[in-house]
From Swiss-Prot:
Keywords: Cytoplasm, GTP-binding, Nucleotide-binding, Protein biosynthesis. Belongs to the TRAFAC class translation factor GTPase superfamily. Classic translation factor GTPase family. PrfC subfamily. It is found in: Cytoplasm. This is Peptide chain release factor 3. GTP binds at residues 17-24, 85-89, 139-142. It holds the Pfam family RF3_C.
Length: 514
């Protein structure tokens, strides 16, 4: 098969949702259909046969939340599917937003009893900004939920996206009978031995069933007043196809997967800082690092840089240019993933996600290219932290482990590090409290370095240019610090302290982000 055909087989997407909407469950069901797991909840290593959950980090297993982005790959129906599972917890939005830069489509999982929730709305805004297609799965029909028409209306009113139902529920909760599949023109049955039935048999199958009568009325209303199906609008991110089902009971999931793969886009191009778009079919390899993850295998204390291949083909052992440094690097030890399981990879093409073993060479946002044409992809989103903690090693004899742990976890982008200009103290910045808890847990469990963390509360952060720096600017209302790139930054007590500083030093430009 030609490289062009291989690229056209790729379907790379992320699953987004509010916590507890069923994202992990539907991910596992998709892996089940891809032959990667024997049953939902257990992920099978391709070679070892060992079981592992898609949530691989200890704290994820303990707390039932996703705090890192997993990458999973499988073949299904002639397609190579790359799923990027994303953190659902709001404190990890920064990692999630970067992950959404590496996909061509998004699957939005919604709890049919709760509708659009806060985190779903936030993540949808990022997807909408990128203009990529969104496919919606209304989950948990095995439980009582809101009226389907209300859910569609909420998509349009809250998210501002038109919707088209691909199927429609017949009852829900204990009265759930199945789905009226509008796209495939059939009935999908929840009970009994037969999975599908013809639509014309519906009146016989559901004779005197008020829920089936309601379904027919809803569909008639949608036919007259609903949106028209348009593949063009779907690919433009203007229309979301809506699928109903139950991930927990694995009902409607395979129908969703089959239909999703018909309409999900092939790998798309990616823009450079100069505004050019790199075509996936360009023969020269290029890619960008969207995530760095330390200790995916605690036995080896390794670190992986996740790279989205934008164009061309990766071949093991190839040399690439690292645009940020202008230096070359050899990609010899490269893997692909199935949650905890990983395999060395010889070849991969545009649309694939590869993991490059990293000894400190790479940073999040790095561009990799080959050939004479050196360029840089547009930067990944960054977020200014609001919460701060002082951090130090509990045991002075563990300083080496402490510094190694901080260096690696900061390079992941999971937390931000600042150093007090006057005292040299380390300060951590985060978007949310949970990031601190995960940092502490990982320092103790992965680096054997207990830490002392002292809350500093909320701060307003502003960067200044190095040439404007004067240490006399530091006062009781601010802290002068350096970020991890040695750029000067002020941590202000509050907005009043920020305004006071701006009035006192009108010639100093304060930047919200560097």
């Amino acid at each position: 098969m030609s490289i062009r055909d291989e690229i056209k087989k790729r379907r790379t997407f992320a699953i987004i949702s509010h916590p507890d909407a069923g994202k992990t469950t539907i991910t596992e069901q998709l892996l089940y259909f891809g032959g990667e797991i024997r049953e939902a909840g257990t992920v099978k290593g391709k070679k070892t046969g060992n079981f592992a959950k898609s949530d691989w980090m200890d704290i994820e297993k303990q707390r039932g939340i996703s705090v890192t982005s997993s990458v999973m790959q499988f073949d299904y129906a002639g397609k190579r599917v790359n799923i990027l599972d994303t953190p659902g917890h709001e404190d990890f939005s920064e990692d999630t937003y970067r992950t959404l830069m590496a996909v061509d489509a998004a699957v939005m999982v919604v709890d049919s009893a709760k509708g659009i929730e806060a985190q779903t709305k936030k993540l949808f805004e990022v997807v909408k900004h990128r203009g990529i297609p969104v496919f919606t799965f209304m989950n948990k029909l095995d439980r009582d939920g809101r009226e389907p028409l209300d859910l569609l209306e909420e998509l349009e009113e809250v998210l501002g996206i038109a919707s088209y139902p691909m199927n429609w529920p017949i009852g829900m909760g204990k009265a759930f009978e199945g789905l009226y599949d509008l796209y495939n023109e059939r009935l999908e049955l929840y009970k009994g031995n037969e999975r599908f039935a013809k639509i014309e048999d519906g009146d016989t199958l559901f004779a005197n069933n008020p829920f089936y009568e309601q379904t027919k009325e809803d569909i008639e209303l949608l036919t007259e007043a609903g949106n028209e199906f348009s593949e063009e609008a779907i690919l433009a991110g203007e229309l979301t196809p809506v699928f109903f089902g139950s991930a927990l009971t694995n009902f409607g999931v395979q129908t969703f997967l089959d239909t999703f793969l018909k309409f999900a886009p092939e790998p798309h191009g990616h823009k450079t800082v100069d505004g050019d778009e790199i075509d996936p079919l360009n023969k020269d390899f290029s890619g960008f690092v969207f995530k760095i993850q330390a200790n995916m295998d605690p036995r080896h204390r390794d670190r992986i840089a996740f790279v989205r291949i934008v164009s061309g083909e990766f071949e093991r052992g190839m040399s690439v240019n690292l645009t940020r440094t202008g230096k070359g690097a050899k990609l010899s030890n490269v893997t692909q993933f199935m949650a905890e399981s990983r395999e060395n990879v010889e070849n991969a093409v545009a649309g694939d996600i590869i993991g490059v073993y990293d000894t400190g060479t790479y940073q999040v946002g790095d561009t990799l290219t080959v050939g004479k044409n050196k360029f840089e992809f547009e930067p990944l989103p960054t977020f200014t932290p609001e919460l701060f903690m002082k951090v130090s090693a509990k045991n002075v004899m563990k300083q080496k482990s402490f510094h190694k742990g901080i260096e690696q976890l900061v390079q992941e982008g999971a937390i931000q590090l600042y150093t007090n200009y006057q005292t040299g103290e380390y300060m951590l910045g985060a978007v949310g409290q949970l990031q601190f808890e995960v940092f502490k847990h990982r320092m103790e469990n992965e680096y054997n370095a207990e830490v002392v963390m002292t809350p500093m509360g909320k701060k307003t952060v502003r960067w200044i240019q190095p040439e404007d720096l004067d240490e006399r600017m530091s006062s009781s209302r601010n802290i002068l610090a350096k970020d991890r790139f040695d750029q000067p930054v002020f941590l202000f007590e509050n907005d009043f302290a920020l305004r006071w500083f701006a009035d006192k030093y009108p010639d100093v430009t304060l930047e919200e982000k560097m």
